Regions:
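Short glycine-/small-residue-rich Rossmann-like dinucleotide-binding loops
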Residues: 10, 122, 141-142, 163-164
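Short amphipathic alpha-helix with an adjacent loop that forms part of the alpha/beta core around
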Residues: 123-133
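Glycine-rich phosphate-binding loop and adjacent beta-alpha segment
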Residues: 15, 144-211
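C-terminal hydrophobic helical "lid"/dimerization subdomain
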Residues: 195-233
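NAD(P)H dinucleotide-binding glycine-rich loop of Rossmann-like/cofactor-binding domains
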Residues: 7-73
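N-terminal Rossmann-like NAD(P) cofactor-binding module of classical short-chain dehydrogenase/reductase
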Residues: 6, 135-138, 160
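Mid-domain Rossmann-like dinucleotide-binding core that forms the NAD(H)/NADP(H) cofactor-binding site
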Residues: 47-120
Length: 233
């Protein structure tokens, strides 16, 4: 056998056919060497969502957000990106607040490491500036939720924004940026350069607890994929 590799992003399964293929012919530059301690099964449990979550955590670290900086909020916390972000942040020693619209996921989020859970309803309306609450944030939702998070950021805080589950609009003002020195850092996982990809996957091996792989995955056969795809949609 040849070298073990993994592939996420670059439009595969989106602009390029073959999402469920057992073999693929792709550009070598798209591939990442399988990091030591990872295998194909674990890599696909992590998937694009987990990889994106790791990039978000790295973005907060790059902005100087440390566990002692204060609480970090994760929106859309019960989704793939959000749940992995909660797990990673908890493992790294951060105090994590998880925002979820589904009460049925609260126990699951606590198991992953959320210190407290907030209802999505609390993020429906916002003012230009609100009480400072968060040192950092991972936002997967966008729209009013992201606007609320920005208004609640501590001075010098950073929001890693990677999703638009709630919409692509951003009804905010410049106030958090010019009065509180808040950083809004976009995070894209599709076109991430090779060096950053390799670093993120190596971090995932180190920073994701083994328990995550059993808590966050349901294994099915290939023939079951269409039925499960319908359920997800």
């Amino acid at each position: 056998p040849g070298q073990q590799v993994l592939l996420t992003g670059w439009g595969v399964g989106e602009n390029h056919w073959g999402g469920l293929a057992t073999q693929a012919r792709v550009k070598g530059d798209w591939l990442v060497p399988m990091p030591k301690g990872m295998d194909g099964r674990k890599a696909m449990i992590v998937g694009t969502a987990g990889f994106t979550a790791m990039l978000c955590v790295m973005a907060l670290e790059d902005a100087g957000i440390r566990p002692e900086s204060g609480e970090v909020v994760v929106t859309g916390a019960s989704g793939g990106v959000g749940s992995t972000a909660v797990t990673l942040l908890h493992k790294l020693g951060y105090q994590v607040a998880a925002v979820s619209g589904r009460e049925s996921t609260h126990d699951y989020l606590r198991q992953l490491g959320a210190n407290r859970i907030l209802s999505r309803d609390e993020f429906a309306e916002t003012r230009p500036l609100e009480k400072q609450v968060w040192a950092g944030a991972v936002d997967t939702v966008g729209d009013k939720v992201l606007a609320k998070v920005l208004a609640q950021m501590n001075y010098g805080g950073c929001v890693a924004a990677c999703g638009l589950a709630g919409g692509f609009a951003l009804p905010t003002t410049v106030m958090p940026f010019i009065l509180r020195n808040v950083r809004l850092q976009g995070v894209d996982s599709v076109m991430t350069p090779a060096a950053r990809r390799t670093e993120a996957w190596e971090r995932l091996v180190r920073d994701l607890p083994e328990s995550f792989y059993t808590q966050s995955a349901t294994e099915i056969t290939l023939s079951q994929a269409p039925d499960y795809a319908s359920k997800i949609m």
